[in-house]
Amino acid sequence: MRWYPWLRPDFEKLVASYQAGRGHHALLIQALPGMGDDALIYALSRYLLCQQPQGHKSCGHCRGCQLMQAGTHPDYYTLAPEKGKNTLGVDAVREVTEKLNEHARLGGAKVVWVTDAALLTDAAANALLKTLEEPPAETWFFLATREPERLLATLRSRCRLHYLAPPPEQYAVTWLSREVTMSQDALLAALRLSAGSPGAALALFQGDNWQARETLCQALAYSVPSGDWYSLLAALNHEQAPARLHWLATLLMDALKRHHGAAQVTNVDVPGLVAELANHLSPSRLQAILGDVCHIREQLMSVTGINRELLITDLLLRIEHYLQPGVVLPVPHL
């Protein structure tokens, strides 16, 4: 896993809390995708399991460090869903918690990393909760999450929340400019599309992601003046439809911002398209379309086995209906 420079302040702050005896036994780390929370947790784990730490760092030479580097440390436990599953079950949690009651194999600390706490089943969360309420000595837990509110309230209450905030925007753009050759506007747009996460922004430039966004923008540039929104189906009906609907939603939001005179927009690399949307669609129509786009996106992400093509087709035909004169628009449900 890759270490990112913006992780250092958080790493040093957390290590200092352990050094001062104020480190919480269960740390709930909230971070956006691409922020590097996995690398932060791994670095903290290496520090806690190091037998001869040097300042804020693990030594890299002791038996504990060697085993961590080899991926075979007997006192380091990773809790993640089994391959092919999207939940973390109670059996895996119980297997680890039983081992935690034993003496540490290397005689030092024990560390447990829950890679995505939101995937814990209720039974698994309750099993983990029992251990968090009475943790074994020298045992540290790291729970990663995108949305803490999805966790059981009792589980959250036993943890200390640490939010891994995105770095300042200009810092992130500078970092991105060293990683990929793109215009400053494209870098800034990717960063804002990723809610400020530099790692997620970089991922947009990998594979065919950015080309897919450009294709969507080109299709939208045709559909807006022509009124043929159904022509967007090919650009949206894809296994990555939630991401593409997110791109569409940000363009609609930027057009709304333009109506209201807001200075900061997300899609700074396509100002002409944003202006076209604002010129052709009133604020009320933009709000109605935006509400439906967000609703469909949520359905695609939360309902298993849903017919994606049918759902998106219905969305696009409904948008065309909204453009007809005299149509009563729905109340926005954002």
Curated annotation (Swiss-Prot):
The keyword Transferase applies. It catalyses: DNA(n) + a 2'-deoxyribonucleoside 5'-triphosphate = DNA(n+1) + diphosphate. Keywords: DNA replication, DNA-directed DNA polymerase, Nucleotidyltransferase, Transferase. One of its GO terms (cellular component) is DNA polymerase III, clamp loader complex. The keyword Cytoplasm does not apply. NCBIfam families: holB, PRK07993.1. This is DNA polymerase III subunit delta'. The gene is holB.
